[in-house]
């Protein structure tokens, strides 16, 4: 009967209320805080920043700056939350460790990749010394660890479990921000026949991990190619916007995520008037963040741009609209 399924033991809902009261009190007393970023509107999509035990999925097409977004976010939360004790565990499947290091140096010294790689002319000695100084400064806050080896979803879970135990203190598990770049690069096989099976398994695994440990997940994902069709690029139409259905394997991750963002770069798609509001697009570095899902915060869209002088993504006011 019931295929020998095990019976689950219900618990009183008062247990949940008790935990809620503890959390409310901890937030009030400042014992529990969100991770604030430099982006006010991004923080508003949450409860004053990234909350622990949440899953955030960020989808974008190649060339829109999603990896820079993630690297800047990690960089900023370390600088802007010095009163919080936490670690960062990055699953970086897409680039070599040295390339990851160059990108981090680029963002922190304000020089682009080609400058650091001496394209056209040798790198300025002052810039190189700033790179060296940044590396030496990281010794005082060595709190970021990276996994570069491709792995399965199960291996990711085992790695997180071991990492949490390794960094456990007498006070308990250490809060950990876990970043994944990107979701489709996990290896398939075993019980996962294809990428879509794997993404469903990933969503379930992330939910299991956030229930078990004080982690916050930031997951980068691709968007489907259909966002680049000529029909979607027609000026002044709703199809210009990123939709939750554009997320690769959308159903698999959407139902598990607490916050879902879609990043768009309208200029790349030759859109001159963005969406029904007809925002005027004349800046190739303008980014539009569509907040597609938010359990506890702001939904809608907000505007950013890549500031190439300082190699950072910065918030900007909405562009003017055409009549």
Predicted features by range, described:
Residues 116-121, 145-149, 188-198, 231-243:
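Flexible beta-alpha connector loops of hexameric P-loop NTPases
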Residues 4-111:
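The Walker A/P-loop phosphate-binding site
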Residues 92-95, 182, 215, 219-225, ...:
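A short beta-strand-to-loop transition that corresponds to the Sensor-1 phosphate-sensing loop
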Residues 73, 99-107, 159, 205, ...:
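Alpha-helical scaffold elements adjacent to nucleotide-binding pockets in ATP/GTP-utilizing enzyme cores
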Residues 56-58, 89-91, 145-147, 218, ...:
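Hydrophobic/aromatic beta-strand patches that form the interior of the parallel beta-sheet core
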Residues 22, 37, 43-45, 80-174, ...:
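Cytosolic-facing regulatory segments adjacent to core modules
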Residues 89, 174-211, 216:
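Helical hairpin unit composed of two closely spaced alpha helices linked by a short loop
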Residues 9-18, 110, 114-117, 136, ...:
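C-terminal regions of RecA-like/P-loop NTPase motor modules
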């Amino acid at each position: 009967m019931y295929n020998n399924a095990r019976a689950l033991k219900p618990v009183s809902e008062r247990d949940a209320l008790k935990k809620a009261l503890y959390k409310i009190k901890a937030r009030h007393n400042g014992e529990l805080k969100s991770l604030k970023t430099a982006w006010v509107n991004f923080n508003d999509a949450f409860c004053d920043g990234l909350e622990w035990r949440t899953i955030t999925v960020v989808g974008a097409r190649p060339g829109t700056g999603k990896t820079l977004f993630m690297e800047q976010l990690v960089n900023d939360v370390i600088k802007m939350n010095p009163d919080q004790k936490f670690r960062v565990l990055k699953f970086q499947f897409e680039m070599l460790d040295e390339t990851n290091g160059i990108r981090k140096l680029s963002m922190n010294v304000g020089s682009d990749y080609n400058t650091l790689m001496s394209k056209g002319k040798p790198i300025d000695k002052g810039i190189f010394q700033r790179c060296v100084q940044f590396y030496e400064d990281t010794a005082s806050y060595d709190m970021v660890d990276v996994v570069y080896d491709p792995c399965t979803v199960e291996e990711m879970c085992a790695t997180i479990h071991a990492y949490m135990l390794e960094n456990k203190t007498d006070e308990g598990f250490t809060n950990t921000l876990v970043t994944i770049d990107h979701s489709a690069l996990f290896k398939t096989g075993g019980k996962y026949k294809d990428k879509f099976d794997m993404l469903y398994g990933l969503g379930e695994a992330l939910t299991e991990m956030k229930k078990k440990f004080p982690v916050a997940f930031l997951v980068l994902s691709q968007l489907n190619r259909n966002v680049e069709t000529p029909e979607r690029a027609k000026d002044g139409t709703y199809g210009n916007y990123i939709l939750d259905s554009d997320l690769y394997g959308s159903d698999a991750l959407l139902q598990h995520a607490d916050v879902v963002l879609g990043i768009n770069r309208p200029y790349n798609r030759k859109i001159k008037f963005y969406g029904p509001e007809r925002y005027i697009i004349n800046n190739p570095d303008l980014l539009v963040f569509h907040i597609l899902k938010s359990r506890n915060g702001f939904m809608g869209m907000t505007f950013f741009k890549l500031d190439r002088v300082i190699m950072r993504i910065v918030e900007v006011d909405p562009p003017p609209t055409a009549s």
